[in-house]
Amino acid sequence: MQVHLRYLLRGRAYDQIRNSVCYPKLNVKICATHSGITVGEDGATHQMIEDISLMRTLPNMTVLSTSDDTQTKWAVEEISKINGPVFLRLARLATPIIYDENQKFEIGKMIQIGEGTDASIFATGVTVAEAIKAKEELEKQGVNIRVIDVHTIKPIDEEMIIKCAKETKKLISVEDHNIIGGLGSSICEVLCDKCPTNLTRLGIKDTFGKSGKAEELMKYFGCLLYTSDAA
């Protein structure tokens, strides 16, 4: 079964998702659009910035957040092979095409873009394109960055996180989501257990969203890395 949910409904439907889908481990795929702050002028009541946190804590749930159209096609194909609940997080905002059709995609395996050793930027969804912009800008200043596309939040790719912690000087996560319980928290949990390392978390800091243009909100909440001092 496939279900499409917009911003408000994934909160209202949480009890049903928990008890009627995840508990019996039903084969239900939830495609949730209009995620994060990029719905812009719709404002705080319509900006779902807690959904990753809500969904990744549910047993049996697989959680994905794709970064472009090509990757979304791969994700839809791959989640159809999973016999169980899946949450696919999608934004309303149009995003640049990052990948060609030949890029390898595997659920639970992050994609590394670049070989830089100065910093690793872990990004998911719409923030991947922004992280790539930051990489390009910082490289002009002699700072070598690798971007890690975290298209699967759960199960998290522990191997890639540990690899980056050992190979790069700084770790940064960026997400259009509350930093409590989201991508950054997922990475911190792995680092705490397996490879204690500092992580700078960028995203919405324990607050509700605001009404405004999508790019203005991304900048306001610190999701446009090339305008920040994080690296």
Where are these regions (language model features)?
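Short, flexible active-site recognition loops that position polar ligands and cofactors
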Residues: 214-225
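Glycine-rich phosphate/diphosphate-binding loop of Rossmann-like nucleotide-binding domains
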Residues: 122-139
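Glycine-rich beta-alpha junction loops
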Residues: 35-37, 92-95, 125-126, 151-152, ...
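Generic long, charged, amphipathic alpha-helical segments
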Residues: 146-164
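Conserved small/polar residues in nucleotide/adenosyl-binding loops
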Residues: 226-231
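Glycine-rich, acidic loop regions that bind phosphate or pyrophosphate groups
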Residues: 32, 186-190, 194-208
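Conserved thiamine diphosphate
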Residues: 1-120
